[in-house]
Amino acid sequence: MDMKKLIERINFLYKKSKEEGLTKEEKVEQQKLRREYIDIIKGNVKVQLEGVEKIPKPNRKN
């Protein structure tokens, strides 16, 4: 599932839970989708951090 559809479904289930409640199956789906979203975000952050290089500070003499 692409990120946009994933977020739309998560938001839909959240709104439904507040308005009328969720079935047991929908609660399971909501948890699964949230876990998938978190895993994607974690993966993106990991890739970003792996691409970071430390740049040494220049030596300054007064």
From Swiss-Prot:
Any one cellular-component term (Gene Ontology): cytoplasm
InterPro entries for the chain: DUF896
Entry keyword annotation includes Transferase: no
Cellular localization per UniProt: Cytoplasm
Keyword Signal on entry: no
Main localization (coarse): cytoplasm
Keywords: Cytoplasm
Similarity field: Belongs to the UPF0291 family.
Name of the protein in question: UPF0291 protein CLM_2971
